[in-house]
Regions:
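Extracytosolic ligand-binding ectodomains
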Residues: 1-179
Length: 179
C-alpha cells in the first residue's frame, strides 16, 4: 500500500515522481497515484516499459509516463527486431529489457571466460571483461577503467491506448506506436 507516499506526493506538489520499482509494486503505486487524482509526471524503470507491464494496468494509468529502457522493442534496429522476433517465437510474448540485458550479459560472460582462458579464475575473467568491447542486442557495450559497463540508454514514453514512442536518442525518436 502506497497511500502514505501518495499523501506525501500530494502535499509536496511534486511535479515528477521517479518510481524505482519492479513491475508489481510499480503497477500498484501508479494505480494509487492516478486513482488519487494526481497528474504528476511519472518516471519509471525499464521494468515499466513493456507489454508485460501493460498487462498489469489499464493503459489510462500509463499515458504520458516516461521510462528509461535498455531495449525499446519496436525500435527500427535490426538487432532489436531479430531478438524480438526470436523471443516472441520462443516465449510467446514481446521481448523486454530484462531479457535483452540477460542475453547480452551471458554472452559477455562467455566471451570474457574465453578471453581469460578460464571459467573459474574470477580475477582473470574480470581482467578480460575490462578489455572487451561488445556489440549485442542492446547495442554497443564497453567497460571503463573502473569496470563499469556503458550500455546505451533509451527513453520511451507511454501514449494513449497503451502504445509507446521513443523520445531518446534523437536518431530513433518516433511517434506513438513505434516504441
Amino acid at each position: 500500500d502506497f497511500s502514505s507516499d501518495v499523501t506525501n506526493i500530494r502535499k509536496s506538489e511534486a511535479r515528477a515522481v521517479m518510481l524505482l520499482m519492479d513491475e508489481e509494486p510499480g503497477a500498484l503505486a501508479i494505480r494509487q497515484i492516478r486513482d488519487a487524482g494526481l497528474d504528476t509526471q511519472l518516471v519509471g524503470t525499464l521494468a515499466m516499459g513493456s507489454d508485460r507491464f501493460l498487462k498489469r494496468l489499464d493503459a489510462k494509468y500509463l499515458d504520458g509516463m516516461v521510462q528509461y529502457s535498455a531495449f525499446p522493442p519496436s525500435a527500427p534496429l535490426q538487432r532489436i527486431q531479430e531478438f524480438g522476433q526470436a523471443y516472441r517465437a520462443h516465449f510467446g510474448e514481446e521481448a523486454h529489457g530484462f531479457a535483452a540485458q540477460s542475453y547480452d550479459g551471458l554472452l559477455l560472460a562467455v566471451n570474457a571466460m574465453q578471453a581469460a582462458g578460464t571459467a573459474t579464475d574470477g580475477a582473470a575473467i574480470q581482467k578480460a571483461l575490462s578489455g572487451l568491447s561488445f556489440d549485442g542486442v542492446i547495442g554497443h557495450v564497453q567497460f571503463d577503467g573502473n569496470n563499469q559497463a556503458s550500455p546505451p540508454v533509451y527513453i520511451t514514453q507511454w501514449c494513449k491506448g497503451g502504445t509507446r514512442k521513443i523520445d531518446f536518442p534523437a536518431d530513433l525518436k518516433s511517434g506513438c506506436g513505434a516504441g
